[in-house]
Each structure stands twice: as C-alpha cells, then as structure tokens.
Amino acid sequence: ERRLEARSWRLAVTTHPPGAQLSIRAAGGAARRARSPYKGTLRGGELELTVTRAGYERLVQRVTLDRHRALDLWLDPPGLLHHKLGELRSGSNPKQVAFSPDGRELWVSLLGGHGVEVFDTRTMRKRKAIRLGQHGAVEVLFTRDGRTVYASQMETASVWEIDRASFRVRRQLATKGNWSKVMALSPDERTLYVANWVSNDISEIDLRKGRVRRLLRTVRTPRGLWPTADGRRLYVAGFENGDLERIDLATGKSRTLLRTGGAMRHLVGDPEGRRLYADDMGTNQAFVVDLASERVRKLAATDNVPNTIDLTPDGRVLYVSNRGRNGSSYYLPGPEWGSVLAIDTASGKVLDAMVGGNQTTGLDVSADGRLLAFSDFLDNRIHLFAVPPYRELAAGGGGRAAAHRAELAKR
C-alpha cells in the first residue's frame, strides 16, 4: 500500500448515462465528490468509487490505482439483477456471439459483413477481423479445447475451419446442402452436423476426411441442432411448421415430437443430458423435453419473436433473446425493442429481464457462467453483462421481469 501511495496517477471516469454523482474514497481517507465525466490526479492505492444518479441503481466499484486508469461504467435501471459491463461496436448485422471456452474472447458472426470479428472480453477491444471470402457468417462454434473455430456460411453452403491462435483459415468444408446455418459437433468431435435451411437436410461431415458422409433428410427449414451425449440421436428444430424432430443416427429414421404450427428456432441441452430446451419464434414460447421419455411441455412464455437460447453451466437458468415484433421487413426496425429473459428452468418463472436494441438476436453465456453477451442485429452492437449467482436471481423478486414490459414499445 505504501508503495502504491508513493506516487500519483491519473484517473478518468465515464458513466452511461453521464452526469452521475461520484464519490471517490481512499482507504481511511475522506471522500472526494465530483460529477461524471471525471478526470483527475490521485494518490495511488485502493479506491472505492460510488456512482449514483436519479432513476438508476447505485454502483460501487473498487479500483486499485497502480497506473493511469480510465473507467467506463454503466448504471443499471432500477431492479435489474444483472450488471452491464459494456457495449461493443461490431460490423454489419451481428447474427451470433460466442465466448471462447476460456472466456477471454468473444467471436461475432457478421451476416451482413465478410466473416467474423474477435473481441477481447477484458479490454472490450476488437482483436481481429477474419474475412471469409465475399460473404458473411451465420454461426460460430468452438471445439471443447478452444483451439478450433467453425463458421457457417449460407451463400456458399460451406463451413470455414479457423485456427483460433493464429486466426487463420485452415480449410473450407462444402456441406453439399443449400443455405447452411446452424452447426453442432458430435460428442467425440469427429463429426460436424450442419443444418441446411433450403435443401431441408443435415450434412454429416467427417472432420478427419473433410467430406460429407451423408445427408439426413429433415422436416422443413431445419435450424437448431442438438446431438445427444451418447451420439445416438440428433434433435432438429424445424422453422417452417414449428417442428421438433428426433433423428436416429444409426438408421437415419426420424420422429416428430412436437408440431406447434409456429417457427421452432434454437435448441440447447442441459449439462446432465436429461433435458432439451427449445424456443418457438411463432408462438413466443420456450419448451422443455424430457430426453428419457421424449415428452415435451411448455416451460414459459417469452417476449415477442424469441431467437437464441443458452443455459448457465449448472443448467438452472435459461437465457432467451427476443427480437421484438417485426417491422415491415426483416431488415427494418420494428415497433418494439428487443430483450433478453432469464428463466428459471425448474419453475419456468422469469427471474430478470434486460431491454436490448433493434432485433436482439445472438446470445451466449460464458463457460464459467459469469458473463452474458447478446447482439442487436440492426444496431451492430453487442452488450456484455455480469451474471449474478443463481441464489441472487432466485431471491431477487423477479428483477425487471415485470417492469421491462413497459419499455419494449418504442415511443
């Protein structure tokens, strides 16, 4: 502590929104009061920053001033249980976001760009833009060790294999389908499954050989995929009719477990392999499947036009991004803001809710369960939040589950 206090350092504090009251207190010292944005020179050491502004939650931040520091702090609306850490500006139409397994990077697929962008989650700065030919990317998928990344591309009906360390493309894998979107790796990671939206099939790619082993026929417009841990079954979300289909990978035969008449979009399984979750863009619902019996039931109602879903590592919270009511075109802003819901998988209750921007779409939870990222497709923006422990969510009285609804309609 004495060494830190031996010299002074510059401190800059920016808040969102600006005009917040700052209280800067050194250990055992008096508080210095100011208004954001703030720039000053202070003695080094441990500082406690308290940020307040009418209409927002109070924020307390502890900082070690051992170098020149610039802080970018976000104030949360009343009742929000998640804390916003920052925003990232991306390229055109961020379709999906994915944390690397070690949580150090966030990869963003750009449907309207030319590939993917990579951000450092600590500094929130862009590390790399990876060009994938003349088109954008739909989804990105990591291997468990985080060394390899796959990016799907609709226009070329292919998957690009990328070396994460060097950001270099190793190879481009043809799917032999049409309009390839969602990917899933087999449990042994020797096979890549790719959903082909227009040709109504799944490409089963042998990754050692780099070739399609077979094409599996599916329900119309397959999107979400989930292979079981034993490698025997593959579940498929069918968008056209709201189908949830199961394929026997030994025989290729299939069975439709549910048809809602809506638009089934995304699938994610729990870590124990007991439950599968699905969301339907047409009916604004989330479903849960008991994988032993294959019985399907409604878990919860969502906001309008749910998109991507993901689970916390313990399987206790399901996050759902919601695009909001559509405008006159998919590529035009609609009358509602997007949102993200945190749903208790045991009860189906909404534990908290965050309001996004125009067409909140991509979503991912980090492997350690500490970070949540989601994208606003039409705003070219990524939001990064800290995820509270489950016990805080469960005891939070629903957070902003009710309050956020009044903020969705644009004024």
Label the model's feature ranges.
Residues 1-83, 386:
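Short loop/turn and low-complexity linker motifs enriched in small/turn-promoting residues
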Residues 10, 72-411:
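Predominantly soluble domains enriched in secretory-pathway, periplasmic, or organellar proteins
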